[in-house]
A protein has these predicted regions:
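Sec-dependent signal peptide cleavage junction
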Residues: 18-26
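Extracytoplasmic "Venus flytrap"
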Residues: 29-50, 55, 66-76, 171-175, ...
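An alpha-beta-alpha
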Residues: 30, 48, 139-189, 285, ...
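Beta-alpha junction/loop-to-helix N-cap segments that form part of ligand/metal-binding clefts
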Residues: 66-129, 224-239, 243-248
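Hydrophobic alpha-helical segments within soluble ligand-binding/sensing domains
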Residues: 121-163, 263-284
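Pocket-lining segment of extracytoplasmic ligand-binding domains
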Residues: 173-245, 249
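Hinge/cleft segment of the Venus flytrap/periplasmic-binding protein
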Residues: 278-341
C-alpha cells in the first residue's frame, strides 16, 4: 500500500512538473506589418513590443514577434502577410488602415485573428460591423481625429485666417473622413480652401511649394501617413513662408509641423498590446471585442517652428488652452527616441 501511495505521489509530482513546464513553455508568434517608416507608427510598434515584454515577464509566456515594413508598397504588403500565413502566426497586427484592410481580406479563410492599430475610421473602411461588436476576426485601436477641434486651434491662433490649404494623400482611407469634415466645416464658415495632394515625398514637396506660391494662411493635414513621411522635407519651407502646419498627430510636430493634435501613440501602442493579450492569453472573442478609441485632447506645439513663424509659445498656449485638455511643447527631431539624447 505504501509503495502504491508512493507511486501515485510520484506520478502526481511528475504530472505537475510537466504541466508547469508546459505553462512555462507557452509561446505565441505575432506578425506585425507596418505601413511606412514614420515616427507615429514606429512609436506604436515600439510600445507594442515593450508592453508584450512586460506581459511575458508577468505571466511566464513568450512572444515571438515577426515584424516587417511594406513602406507604402501594396505588393510588398501582400507578400509580408502571405509569409505570416505560411509561418502560421498566432495573431497578426496591421499598423494603419491599408495594412489592416489587406490583412482582413487575406485572413478571412484562415481564422487567424487580426488586431489593427491606428485605423482612423474602422467602420468607414469596412473593417468592422460596429465599433462595439466588430463581428469577424478583426478588431483593434482607432486614432479617430476630431477635425473640428483642430480647426478651433487654427482660428484661435489666427482669427483672420481666410485661406486654408488641405494637404493629404487622396488614396489614404485615414484622410477621407477628416478631409470631408474639414470641407464641410469651412464651407459652413464661408472660408476658402484649396486641396493639395501627394502620393510620395517628392509630390508632397511640390504640393508644399504650391501652398507657398498660393500664399495660404494655414495648412491642415489629418492622420495621413504619406504626409507624415514627408514632414521632415517640408516643415522648414512652410515655416520660412510664415504658414503654420496643423496636423492630426504629435509625431508631425516632432518632425517640424507647427502643431499636432490628437491621440497619444505610445498609449495607443500599449492598448493594442493589451488587446493582443486579451485574445491570445485570456481567450477573448475577437468578434465581440470592442474597438478602442482615445480622446486625450492634447495639442503638441513645436517650439522651434513656433519661433520660426514669429509666434510666442506662451501666447499660443494661452490661446489654445480653452480648446484642449493640455498644451505641450516639443522640439524638432527625427524620432521620439532622439528627444532623450
Amino acid at each position: 500500500m505504501k509503495k502504491l501511495l508512493s507511486l501515485v505521489l510520484t506520478l502526481a509530482l511528475l504530472l505537475g512538473a510537466c504541466s508547469f513546464a508546459a505553462a512555462e513553455a507557452q509561446s505565441f508568434t505575432v506578425g506585425i506589418c507596418n505601413f511606412v517608416d514614420d515616427a507615429s507608427l514606429n512609436q506604436i510598434i515600439a510600445n507594442i513590443r515593450d508592453r508584450l515584454e512586460e506581459v511575458a515577464q508577468e505571466r511566464g509566456v513568450t512572444f515571438e514577434i515577426k515584424e516587417d515594413n511594406c513602406n507604402l508598397d501594396g505588393s510588398v504588403m501582400q507578400q509580408i502577410i502571405s509569409d505570416f500565413i505560411a509561418d502560421e502566426v498566432d495573431l497578426m497586427v496591421g499598423v494603419a488602415t491599408p495594412v489592416a484592410m489587406t490583412m482582413q481580406s487575406m485572413t478571412e479563410e484562415t481564422g487567424i485573428p487580426v488586431i489593427f492599430a491606428a485605423v482612423s475610421d474602422p467602420l468607414g473602411a469596412g473593417l468592422v460591423a460596429s465599433m462595439d461588436a466588430p463581428g469577424a476576426n478583426i478588431t483593434g485601436t482607432s486614432d479617430y481625429l476630431d477635425t473640428a477641434a483642430v480647426f478651433n486651434l487654427i482660428f484661435a491662433a489666427n482669427p483672420e485666417a481666410s485661406r486654408i490649404a488641405l494637404l493629404y494623400n487622396p488614396a489614404e482611407d485615414a484622410s477621407t473622413a477628416p478631409i470631408a469634415a474639414a470641407k464641410a466645416l469651412l464651407e459652413e464658415k464661408g472660408i476658402a480652401y484649396k486641396e493639395y495632394s501627394g502620393s510620395n515625398i517628392s509630390e508632397v514637396v511640390l504640393a508644399a511649394d504650391a501652398i507657398i506660391a498660393d500664399d495660404m494662411d494655414a495648412v491642415f493635414t489629418p492622420t495621413d501617413n504619406t504626409i507624415m513621411a514627408a514632414e521632415l522635407s517640408i516643415y522648414e519651407k512652410l515655416a520660412e513662408a510664415g504658414i503654420p502646419h496643423y496636423t492630426g498627430a504629435d509625431s508631425f510636430a516632432l518632425n517640424g509641423a507647427f502643431l499636432g493634435y490628437g491621440v497619444d501613440y505610445a498609449n495607443l501602442g500599449r492598448a493594442t498590446a493589451d488587446m493582443i493579450v486579451q485574445v491570445l492569453l485570456d481567450g477573448a472573442d475577437i468578434a465581440a471585442l470592442p474597438v478602442m478609441t482615445f480622446d486625450n485632447g492634447t495639442a503638441t506645439v513645436n517650439t522651434d517652428t513656433c519661433a520660426a513663424l514669429g509666434l510666442d509659445y506662451d501666447a499660443i498656449a494661452e490661446a489654445f488652452a480653452p480648446f484642449c485638455t493640455q498644451v505641450q511643447p516639443i522640439t524638432t527631431a527625427e524620432s521620439f527616441d532622439d528627444l532623450g539624447e
